[in-house]
Amino acid sequence: MTMQYINQTWLGKKVILGQTDIDASKPVNVLIGFHGAESTPENMLIHGNRLSLTNTVTVYPEGPVDAGNSVWSWWLDGPRQKEAVQQFLEFTSSMIDEAHRFMKEQNTANGFHTCLWGFSQGGAAALVYALMGKYPVHKVASICGFLPELPDITAKNEPTQILGIFGTHDDVVPSFLADHALDEMKGHGHTLSAKETPQGHEVSAENIQDLIRFFES
C-alpha cells in the first residue's frame, strides 16, 4: 500500500507525515518513528517506507537535540543524561499532542491508537516513552534499542505490547544491553516479544516483516 508523504513543522521541528488510504470507520494506527542518534527523519523514512501497513498514519519527527552538521538526537550522553531524558519525555508528549490534534482534524470516527517504533537511540526512545511517558501507547517496537540512564521519577506508563529485536553481531549496541533493556520492560509489566537475530546494527528486511506482522495484528 502506497504511502503519501508531506512535510510539516510541529513545535518548531520538521515532521514527515505519511498516510495510506484511511477507513475512518475503523481504528487508525498513528505510528511515530524515532530516528537514531545524530540522524534525521529522512534517514528513518528510508526504513519506514518499507513498511506496508494499512489504516496507518506515520509520523517521523526530528529529534530536539542539535548534534551539529544538520543532524539530531533525542538526548546527549554524559553526566546530565537523566535530565536530558526527562526533557525528551516532555518533548515527545508535546509531539504526541500535535499528532492527536492532527488526527482529530481527520474525523476518525472510531478513534486511533498511538504506536511507537525506533532504531538504535530511536529504539531506546520508544522504550523510554513506553516506560515513563505521559500518554499510554498501544504498541511499541525497538530495533537495536537499549535503555539510557533514567530520570528519578516514579511515574510509570500503562503496560503495553513490546516487540524488541536485537542482533548478536551488533557492534554499536551490544546484545546484552538490548536484552537487559527488554528484561527491564518485562519487569515493569509490559507484554514482551523479544527476538535475537544474527544481524548487526541495522534494520534488515526480516525486521521489516516482523514489524508489519506486529503492527498489523
Residue ranges and their predicted role:
Residues 6-109:
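Serine-hydrolase catalytic machinery in alpha/beta-hydrolase-like enzymes
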Residues 46, 128-132:
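Active-site signature of alpha/beta-hydrolase-fold catalytic machinery across serine-
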Residues 70-77, 145-162:
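Flexible "cap/lid" loop of the alpha/beta hydrolase fold
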Residues 135-147:
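A conserved short beta-strand
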Residues 163-166, 170:
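Short beta-strand/loop motif that positions the catalytic acidic residue
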Residues 171-177:
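Conserved alpha/beta-hydrolase "acid-adjacent" motif
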Residues 179-217:
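C-terminal catalytic histidine-bearing segment of alpha/beta-hydrolase fold enzymes
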